[in-house]
Amino acid sequence: MPHQQMLILFGLLPVATNISTWWNFGSMLLACSSMQVLTGFFLAVHYTANINLAFSSIVHITRDVPYGWMMQNLHAIGASMFFICIYIHIARGLYYGSYLNKKTWLSGTTLLIMLMATAFFGYVLPWGQMSFWAATVITNLLTAIPYLGTTMTTWLWGGFAINDPTLTRFFALHFILPFGIISLSSLHIMLLHEDGSSNPLGTNSDIDKIPFHPYHTYKDLLMLSLMVLMLLMTVSFLPDIFNDPENFSKANPLVTPQHIKPEWYFLFAYGILRSIPNKLWGALALAMSITILLTVPFTHTSTIRSMMFRPIMQLMFWTLVATFMVITWAATKPVEPPFTMISQIASTIYFLFLIMNPIAGWIENNILKYN
């Protein structure tokens, strides 16, 4: 292990020659993480975690602080970029069988949960109308837990309703969690280099490797440059593209928005939650929509690692991608027909993919055996 760390240090780590552009998203996530920590620090310097001043402090940052508008937009749009990269990173892991590197996959799924928690806490901080009501709805799900739910919710809120103590602790959590993410990311990378990364063919690449630098460094830099270009263009020309109009109004506990929805990157999980009429089962489905990824390495039954040579699984994978998008779209709509039915069907298909994974593997194994 120390020998491998030395190789990483000097950019001489042997890497498979045939890894494609889909393997670049790990380094892009590292860049996103660094940018979020830096911009977040400069925003925290000017932010005030008080329900009467939080909204005004965001206005102050965007209007009065030199380049504050840029910091705020880079941080907000950077979070969206972070999630785009992480969803592609996970999709690549599913498609090419990277999840068979179990320790790396499990640490990565834990990272995703931490990242989603951090983003949720951050969304509450501007104390806009949608921030407040999204926080109320999501944290209120804890009350669905039998016996302990109400106590846990009161403990999280710091009172009997979302108020000043809630905002203070959410700011503290939003500040501290990224350091946990950085630590776990380091562990994730160390675990990856213990076995080495996979490749599109899903074969052992020990016989065909090249140094990471300069070959893959330049390949990574190209995608990184494109990401930075997209980020800066969005910040400059469409800074409010991901914002909810409701969030430009200060939080008002007496006025409920017509339609409560979190940021776009949570909509698939929120759509699954909304599609189930029961509160407890809805909360469980919400948790399962993420944690079910932990089961994938243990339900792989195929003799072939990559989906590149598995047509049945390819069909299922692209159905999953389409389902993810449909749930995200349906979650932006009001809770009424036909959107409730669409969400329920899409949610069922979403979970079916992960249940059908071992069955598809057995079918493919039998087809290969008899040919």
Swiss-Prot record:
Cofactor note: Binds 2 heme b groups non-covalently.
Primary gene name: MT-CYB
Described function: Component of the ubiquinol-cytochrome c reductase complex (complex III or cytochrome b-c1 complex) that is part of the mitochondrial respiratory chain. The b-c1 complex mediates electron transfer from ubiquinol to cytochrome c. Contributes to the generation of a proton gradient across the mitochondrial membrane that is then used for ATP synthesis.
Binding sites annotated in the UniProt record for a ubiquinone: H193
Localization per Swiss-Prot or TrEMBL: Mitochondrion inner membrane
Annotated source species: Eryx miliaris nogaiorum (Black sand boa)
Binding site for heme b b562: H75, H174
Topology versus the membrane: Multi-pass membrane protein
Requisite cofactors: heme b
Chain residues that bind heme b b566: H89, H188
Protein family membership: Belongs to the cytochrome b family.
Miscellaneous: Heme 1 (or BL or b562) is low-potential and absorbs at about 562 nm, and heme 2 (or BH or b566) is high-potential and absorbs at about 566 nm.
Regions annotated as coiled coil: none
Pfam families documented for this protein: Cytochrom_B_C, Cytochrome_B
Membrane-spanning residues: 25-45, 69-90, 105-125, 170-190, 218-238, 280-300, 312-332, 339-358
GO MF terms held by the record: metal ion binding; ubiquinol-cytochrome-c reductase activity
Name of this protein: Cytochrome b
Keywords: Electron transport, Heme, Iron, Membrane, Metal-binding, Mitochondrion, Mitochondrion inner membrane, Respiratory chain, Transmembrane, Transmembrane helix, Transport, Ubiquinone
One BP term from GO: mitochondrial electron transport, ubiquinol to cytochrome c
Chief location category: mitochondrion
Subunit details: The cytochrome bc1 complex contains 3 respiratory subunits (MT-CYB, CYC1 and UQCRFS1), 2 core proteins (UQCRC1 and UQCRC2) and probably 6 low-molecular weight proteins.
CC annotations in GO: mitochondrial inner membrane; respiratory chain complex III
